[in-house]
Structures are given as structure tokens and as C-alpha cells.
């Protein structure tokens, strides 16, 4: 928390020294736990944290009876010195003087930090990233039980993003959200040696959905390995199931859209 406040305070100090009176700071802190697998063995694990902020500088000015509020945005890192920040903000303030947006009021806040909003319904923000990544790793390999078809490799990325928004009119709010992404390669060595690539992304702890995806991918990969040459062209009875039904009907839905006429 101290580091977070320090970064914001450094930006605020540089804004004041640069003569900027109107501003909005959107600081983002992204933490991640990453797992890399070869077959079922954990090959590498990594944790990282990226902290940066988007700073919008506003400049109020008039020409005749017309009143404007120009703006310019810059992206800053916590590694920047205060001197670097001051120069960037002075340049942004100068650039904002050429942007003739009709004047409008910035959103007003209370001047007090609002309680952080956690997306608790997802159950991702209130667990450690290592725990989240571990749960999805368990789900990923739960269906990998056969010898002829298996997961060749996999990657899992559990991320948590904290966003902190501060402006010159007293707004001070923050929120936190979690997300899990990754990819895996299924391989079947019975018959033809084939591989199937899949990726995934979840905003909640739906590990069962990942299990189903792995199970379906393994089954499809085995079917591909056992595939034979297509029969001659003609009329055949074909049964579609699962996601393939949705996929074929999406063609007709798209073609019936008014924009396609």
C-alpha cells in the first residue's frame, strides 16, 4: 500500500511543479503468477508485477467567447524520476493548449479515498495468485489420464489488476479484478501423430469449465488421429453435436443480419 501511495504522490508532486491544475491519474498494478508445463511436469514458474499510470493533463482556455478544455495523455512508469515526470507533464500541458474541446466539468468526488471495490463474486480477487494458478493446474490435468492421448505442454497465467483513479476534483477510487488465461497442446500418438492447440480465459473460478474443455479437446485429438481419407463427394447423413451445432448456425445468423443485406 505504501508503494502505491508513493507512486501517486510522486506523480502529484510532479504535476504541481509542472503547473498542471487539472488532471486525472489512472494507476494500474498488474500482478501475475505463471506456470509452464512440459507434459505433467512443472518446467518453470514465474511471478511478476508491473506498475504504470496513464495521466491525462487538462488545460482550460478561451478564444473570444468560446471556452475550451484541451487535454493530452501520457503513460508513465514507477521507474521514472520526478524530473522526467515534470518534463512530460509540461509537454502535455503545452500540447493540450492546441486541443479545442468544448469546455466541460470534470467529475467531482468527495476528496476522500473510497473503499476499494473487489469483484468478490468471481472468487479470484480474494485468493492468492499462486493458489488460483494451482487450482487451474489441477483442473487442467484432471482429465489427462490416458497414454495414447495426453497434454503435451501447457501454460497458465493468473493475474490480478488493481486500478486506482485520482483526479483534481476530489475523485479517489480503486477496484481490483482477477483473470486466468492460458493455453495447452493435446497430442495423440495412436494412429497418426496429431496435435491440437487450445487457449482459454476465465474471469471466475470455473475450473470445471476448463476440465470440460480439456476432455473435449483430448477426445477430438484422438478422433483426428484416427481419421481416414474423406469419402467421395455426395450426400451423407451427418450428426452434429455440442459446439459444432452453434458454429454451423452462426453462419446463418450472420447472413440474416440486416447489415449483410
Q: What is the predicted role of each segment?
A:
Residues 1-261:
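Active-site bordering "gate/hinge" segments
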Amino acid at each position: 500500500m505504501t508503494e502505491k501511495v508513493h507512486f501517486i504522490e510522486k506523480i502529484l508532486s510532479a504535476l504541481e511543479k509542472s503547473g498542471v491544475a487539472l488532471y486525472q491519474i489512472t494507476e494500474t498494478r498488474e500482478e501475475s503468477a505463471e506456470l509452464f508445463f512440459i507434459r505433467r511436469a512443472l518446467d518453470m514458474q514465474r511471478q511478476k508485477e508491473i506498475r504504470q499510470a496513464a495521466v491525462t493533463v487538462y488545460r482550460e482556455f478561451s478564444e473570444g467567447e468560446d471556452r475550451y478544455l484541451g487535454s493530452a495523455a501520457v503513460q508513465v512508469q514507477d521507474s521514472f524520476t520526478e524530473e522526467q515526470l515534470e518534463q512530460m507533464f509540461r509537454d502535455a500541458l503545452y500540447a493540450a493548449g492546441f486541443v479545442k474541446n468544448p469546455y466541460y466539468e470534470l467529475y467531482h468526488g468527495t476528496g476522500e479515498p473510497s473503499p476499494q471495490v473487489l469483484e468478490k463474486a468471481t472468487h479470484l480477487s480474494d485468493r492468492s495468485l499462486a493458489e488460483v494458478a494451482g487450482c487451474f493446474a489441477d483442473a487442467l490435468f484432471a482429465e489427462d489420464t490416458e497414454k495414447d492421448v495426453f497434454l503435451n505442454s501447457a501454460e497458465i497465467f493468473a493475474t490480478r489488476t488493481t486500478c486506482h483513479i485520482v483526479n483534481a476534483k476530489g475523485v479517489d477510487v480503486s477496484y481490483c479484478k482477477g483473470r486466468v488465461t492460458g493455453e495447452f497442446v493435446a497430442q495423440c500418438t495412436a494412429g497418426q501423430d496429431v496435435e491440437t492447440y487450445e487457449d482459454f480465459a476465465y474471469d471466475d473460478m470455473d475450473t470445471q469449465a476448463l476440465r470440460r474443455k480439456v476432455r473435449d479437446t483430448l477426445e477430438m485429438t484422438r478422433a483426428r488421429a484416427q481419421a481416414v481419407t474423406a469419402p467421395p463427394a455426395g450426400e451423407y447423413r451427418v450428426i452434429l453435436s455440442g459446439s459444432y451445432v452453434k458454429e454451423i448456425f452462426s453462419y446463418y445468423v450472420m447472413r440474416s443480419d440486416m447489415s449483410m443485406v
